[in-house]
Curated annotation (Swiss-Prot):
Coiled coil: none annotated. Residues 221-256, 263-275 have a biased composition (Low complexity). Acts in the modification of cell walls via demethylesterification of cell wall pectin. Residues 276-287, 313-338 have a biased composition (Polar residues). In the N-terminal section; belongs to the PMEI family. Expressed in flower buds. This is Putative pectinesterase/pectinesterase inhibitor 43. Glycans are attached at N267, N637. GO terms for biological process: cell wall modification; pectin catabolic process. The lineage of its organism: Eukaryota, Viridiplantae, Streptophyta, Embryophyta, Tracheophyta.
Length: 701
């Protein structure tokens, strides 16, 4: 039934109640109570139907909200998030019981189950943040408010799926059992995302007024209804809610807001789990590789071939030249509306990719809006030039306060609200580093991405360690930054999944960093992430995950794989069609190192493949060398996600960018200039609200 018809029915019911009360005033109180109760139930049922109309799992939505005895749509929407939390907690508790005997008998199943418990806590945290922000229901820009809700709900979906994926290759029967007990929680979270994505329509349908907000001068003002995109710009940089909040029972709530549903023609996600194989080789058996490193493999930059392009082949590292340079005069920022979409018409930084280290990075430019002016100053300076005042210095030779990064992280105040700078001096640090969820506003500053290197060698083989646990460095604390650091995993191609860096933090920024490995080098796991002037190398799926990640002016280097393997740059893991996530490669370069070029005809390389049903990858204004196969994209299997994925290439250059022989799947899109702007950093990461005062050219489009 159309929602407006339902509203009419609701109004009619309310009118009937009023008439009964007016004309039957002398009736017994019991009769009046029954009429009230029945009318309230009918109104609640109608309201639930309207709320659930946009969801993919309507039966789960209506049956769960039927337990909430409130006709107020705001209470019902908040209860939808609460009920998802309860369902997830119930599911993981059930899973811990059902899998106990298997976990007791097998160490790897036990570790996967423990990882699941941790991930479910993270999924619940994101739902709590959503619920708490909805409870406050204060905003100056509806679209920014909904953006936060959708990012966190997308994160919750990803955490739940990561739990299930963790059993693949370890205990497939346990994976099936866990998927079964977690299914309802996944469905309710997906429904929550659908509700959030259509929140503006719900507010209008229920005629819920936008909230009163206090202006800067202290006067109260009310935001008018209508399109949220035309409202005054506000901040979406709210501090994280109290993580210790445990009020998860359905209760009363205020209202909230919305973001449009993804415009691509995508179908409803299936429940089947398609998990990433150990490698992409046609022959799946284990093979040795002469390229498996026997020590830290990244003491310097990998040589780049100079036969396939005309780009400079110098090092992209900046340790020998300071970023600050007074030679570059300030340049005025131009309006993003009047600026040409292709920044290369006026500026071609890609052809000078290796000279970016000479450009002056101002304290207020080039960074997303969550980067404070203080943090921008820190990113623009070099520690040895006394530009950064570190809270802690880490040095292997004992010249700092700490000898290990773990010791320095132990000094970060819990739920820190100010930037905590850790200067990591030159050296190779072989330690497993974790920035926990309670370590907020942490910043790593090194002496150069080839001089300060954090390394590890944990991999799936031979010990069957889950991909999530293989990371040399794991970043979970929000507002994390890293500058001039190298991250690597030296396990080698023969040991399959081996993550150098996993990022689950919201508002994470990486500048002039290297991420080096083979399979699964960089795990962009969840939330909003921005990479600038970075270098990522690997073989299979070496940028993967389900974050909302933008790579700007970065370099992606394909390395030599095992004998029968193919190389894939990206494997994006968007599972729900309404998730706002995706991988955007903007104004960058995709190339191969010297070891790969001799085998590129036999070991073909592709831009990406779909890890999950609604995988979304956008490559724009990027130099693509002839290391990429003319077909461009690789199937996961014969038919999986070919109709539901969203892959597009826009205004790229280079000998590997030709579209004539690209695959012709339904999910491969050709987009207009206007559509491309939605994926440019300014819009995709809300970068159009960045502070415009910059001394270097900046183009949000």
């Amino acid at each position: 039934m159309n929602k407006y018809v339902l509203l009419g029915v609701t109004a009619l019911i309310m009118a009937m109640v009023i008439c009964v009360e007016a004309n039957d005033g002398n009736s017994p109180s019991r009769k009046m109570e029954e009429v009230h109760r029945e009318s309230k139930l009918m109104i609640t049922k109608t309201t639930v139907s309207i709320i659930c109309a946009s969801t993919d799992y309507k039966q789960d939505c209506t049956t769960s909200l039927a337990t909430v005895r409130s006709p107020d749509p705001r209470n019902l929407i908040r209860s939808a998030f609460d009920l998802a939390i309860i369902s997830i907690r119930s599911g993981i508790d059930r899973g811990m019981i059902d899998l106990k005997s298997r976990a007791d008998a097998d160490m790897h199943t036990r570790e996967a189950l423990n990882t699941c418990r941790e991930l479910m806590d993270d999924a619940i945290d994101d739902l709590r943040k959503t619920r708490d922000k909805f409870r406050g229901f204060l905003f100056t820009r509806l679209s920014d408010f909904v953006e936060d809700l959708c990012v966190w709900l997308s994160g919750s979906i990803t955490y739940q799926q990561t739990c299930i994926d963790g059993f693949e290759g370890i205990d497939s029967e346990a994976a099936v059992m866990m998927e079964r007990v977690m299914r309802k929680g996944q469905h309710l979270t997906s429904n929550g995302l659908a509700i959030a994505a259509n929140l503006d329509k719900l507010l209008k349908a229920f005629r819920i007024p936008f909230p009163f907000l206090r202006s800067r001068r202290g006067r109260l003002g009310i935001l008018g209804s209508g399109s949220s995109r035309d409202e005054s710009v506000g901040s979406s940089q709210d501090s994280p809610p109290n993580e210790d909040s445990s009020d998860d029972s359905p209760s009363t709530v205020d209202s909230s807001e919305n973001q449009p549903v993804d415009s691509s023609s995508e179908n409803q996600s299936s429940d089947s789990s398609n998990n990433r194989p150990l490698d992409s080789s046609k022959n799946q058996q284990m093979e040795s590789s002469e390229d498996t490193p026997k020590k830290s493999a990244f003491s310097g930059n990998q040589p780049l071939d100079d036969s396939s392009d005309k780009l400079p082949q110098k090092s992209t590292s900046s340790e020998n030249q300071p970023l600050d340079s007074s030679e570059n005069p300030p340049q005025k920022s131009t309006s993003s509306e009047n600026r040409p979409l292709d920044p290369l018409r006026k500026l071609n930084p890609l052809n000078k990719l290796d000279s970016l280290k000479d450009r002056h990075l101002s304290e207020e430019g080039e960074f997303p809006p969550w980067v404070t002016p203080h943090s921008r100053r820190l990113l623009a300076r070099r520690p040895r030039n006394n530009g950064i005042k570190a809270n802690v210095v880490v040095a292997k030779d004992g010249s700092g306060k700490c000898k290990t990064i773990a010791q320095a992280l132990a000094m970060v105040p819990m739920k820190n609200t100010k930037k905590f700078v850790i200067h990591i001096k030159e050296g190779v640090y072989k330690e497993k580093v974790e920035v926990t969820k309670k370590m907020l506003h942490v910043m790593f500053v090194g002496d150069g991405p080839t001089k300060t290197v954090i390394t590890g060698d944990i991999a799936f083989l031979p010990d069957q360690v889950g991909t999530y646990r293989t990371a040399s460095v794991a970043v979970n604390g929000d507002y994390f930054m890293a500058k001039d650091i190298g991250f690597e995993n030296t396990a080698g191609a023969a040991r399959h999944q081996a993550v150098a860096l996993r990022v689950s933090a919201d508002f994470a920024v990486f500048f002039n960093c290297h991420m080096n490995g083979y399979q699964d080098t960089l795990y962009v796991h969840t939330h909003r992430q921005f990479y600038r002037n970075c270098r990522v190398s690997g073989t299979i799926d070496f940028v993967f995950g389900d974050a909302k990640a933008v790579f700007q002016n970065c370099e992606f280097v394909i390395r030599r794989p095992m004998e029968h393997q193919q190389c894939i740059v990206t494997a994006q893991g968007r599972k729900d069609r309404r998730e706002t996530t995706g991988i955007v490669i903007h104004n960058s370069r995709i190339t191969g190192d010297a070891s790969y070029l001799p085998v590129k005809a036999k070991n073909r390389a592709f831009l990406g493949r779909p890890w999950k049903e609604f995988s979304r990858t956008i490559i724009m204004n990027t130099e693509i060398d002839d290391v990429i196969d003319p077909e461009g994209w690789l199937k996961w299997n014969e038919t999986f996600a070919l109709n539901t994925l969203f892959y597009t290439e826009y205004r790229n250059r280079g000998r590997g960018s030709g579209q004539g022989r690209r695959v012709r799947w339904r999910g491969i899109k050709r987009i207009s200039d206007r559509a491309a702007r939605e994926f440019a950093p300014g819009n995709f990461l809300r970068g159009n609200t960045w502070i415009p005062q910059t001394r270097i050219p900046y183009n949000a489009n």
